Amino acid sequence: MGANLSMPRQPGANKSLQPVKKPTLAAVLIVKNEADNLKACLASLDGLVDEIVILDSGSQDETPAIAAEFGARFFVNTVWPGFGRQRRLAQSHVQSEWVLWLDADERLTPELKEAIATVMANPASDTIYSIPRLSWVFGRFIRHSGWYPDRVLRLYPKALT
């Protein structure tokens, strides 16, 4: 059974409808000697981000090669200016409209990827999103004493910075 829908004619109704443009998203990391962690972190981003920006603080391991394997835009700054300044420097290399910060030892779960994709389908341009972080200490996740969910601000439009 088909449906026959008609819309009232409006001025400009002959203009073709344009698809809504999805904003671009960059994953951004600052790293040093993270070869043991980086591959799994970057693999967890597959299909979600438009660019990966990595600012390296002077790795002596395979970190640069792993970043290249994932097509990351890789920059180096070995003069450590402090955590905040290093993050701002990394973000200055971002070309995307939105920023997702990660540490190399973090992974996106399938549920978190889906939640981020949902937000990115129709994001609020004036909102900074927090992500629940589950900490792993001494071989166990910490889910007590107020440690979970440890919410961290990680997803936001670059224009807000």
Q: Predicted regions: what is each one?
A:
Residues 2-44:
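N-proximal low-complexity "stem/linker" segments adjacent to membrane-targeting elements
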Residues 8-10, 84-92, 97-102, 109-161:
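Catalytic-site signature of metal-activated, phosphate-bearing donor transferases
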Residues 14, 38-42, 60, 85-88, ...:
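A generic local structural motif
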Residues 29, 50-58, 75, 104:
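Short beta-strand/loop segment that forms part of the nucleotide-sugar
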Residues 39, 61-70, 111-112:
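Acidic helix N-cap motif at the loop->helix transition within catalytic regions
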Residues 44, 56-66, 79, 103:
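A conserved acidic beta->alpha catalytic loop
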Residues 50, 64-93:
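Conserved donor nucleotide-binding strand/loop of the catalytic core
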